[in-house]
């Protein structure tokens, strides 16, 4: 769950 969320946040914050 943590890895999934971290990946999502990384993509969302990918500037």
UniProtKB/Swiss-Prot annotation:
Assigned EC number: 2.7.2.3
Keywords assigned: ATP-binding, Calvin cycle, Chloroplast, Kinase, Nucleotide-binding, Plastid, Transferase
Keyword Chloroplast found: yes
Record pathway: Carbohydrate biosynthesis; Calvin cycle
GO biological processes: reductive pentose-phosphate cycle
Family to which the UniProt record says this protein belongs: Belongs to the phosphoglycerate kinase family.
One Gene Ontology term of the molecular function aspect: ATP binding
Cofactor(s) for this UniProt protein: Mg(2+)
Protein name: Phosphoglycerate kinase, chloroplastic
Subcellular locations according to the entry: Plastid, Chloroplast
Subunit structure: Monomer.
A GO CC annotation given for this chain: chloroplast
Origin species: Physcomitrium patens (Spreading-leaved earth moss)
Catalytic activity: (2R)-3-phosphoglycerate + ATP = (2R)-3-phospho-glyceroyl phosphate + ADP
């Amino acid at each position: 769950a943590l890895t999934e969320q971290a990946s999502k946040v990384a993509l969302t914050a990918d500037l």
